[in-house]
Amino acid sequence: MDACIAPATDKLIVDVVFPFTLSTPKYGPSRPFTGNHAAKAAYVDALEAELASLDDEVCMRPVSAVRLSGGASIMSADKVCHLVRRIKKTLNLVPGAEISIDVEPLTVCTPSLTDWTSCGITRVNLAALSCDDAELTALGAHHSREQLQNALLFLEKFHMANVNFEVLYGVPGQTAASWKRTLLTLAGIDALHVSIRPLVDAASDKAWTAAQTGKANTAQEGVPAAPLPSPETRRALYEQAQRILGERGYTEIAPGDFAKSGLAPASGVFGPLMRAGADVLGLGAGARSRLDGFLYENACDYDLYVAKSADFEAIVRNPLREDEQSLHARVCPPIENLTAAQRFEFLETIGATLAR
């Protein structure tokens, strides 16, 4: 192992992981738990216990951004907001720190938005996936195009303008024409920030899920997932997005991330800092951390995490020092230093895990 190297930035960001899903997806990355109301409530309580167990040294570090990731929006909004308030009291958030939440369109409504805005959530990462009903069906999505439109109306009603729209390329059955319609729809509503991500086959996530939970990831309702398009087709779709969004006033600020030109805040805070190599404090089952040159991962086992979340030694898996090779693998150079081929390679390699 090479000697530990300094991080690319001295910033600290916090990733609070909610490994819950409404149902098993056809495609990954997988979230292994569905869970009833009681299980979800117990999980949030465990997050608060892990938060309370942090060392004073960690709690004193300035935090630039907090992300509530995964299935955060399908949890009780009241419980999530209580957790956010605990985070604010426990950690040293800098003035104006970003607090973002990953959101399923079906969960965007008056009660959830009332809670999210009241506790200080400042950014929404909306899992739009596609603006085409046939593609949403192929993905096994929980929402339709109409329900996505309804979510946008609610966000507008609550003046939540800091929204990132995540859409997927490489969907089975996706064509250049359907992909163009999705991109034009987002440009037509003046989306400030659009993230395009490669669709990941659940099978690629199968080994990790099985190792962590003892259960293999399977296609939704036992139906085999359709094969993904070829790399050549996927690259053509990526390049198509670059052209269409570029012609409509968007700048690619990182591989797959497009912001309205001249609107720097639209790029968010968490994502750029993650790509720059910021230290990451991960909280929750399966959360991954990088602190002071060490990498470690929390166990994904729900029962273990809920019972032992305050015991670092009981829940942490595979702590090791980060070497230069692993740092370079996850840090994205400035986009102007990347060729077109390098941008696509970076996005395809780790794009599905990129923060927005």
Q: What positions do the PLM features span?
A:
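Flexible, acidic/Gly-rich N-terminal and inter-domain linker regions that tether
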Residues: 1-23, 28, 74
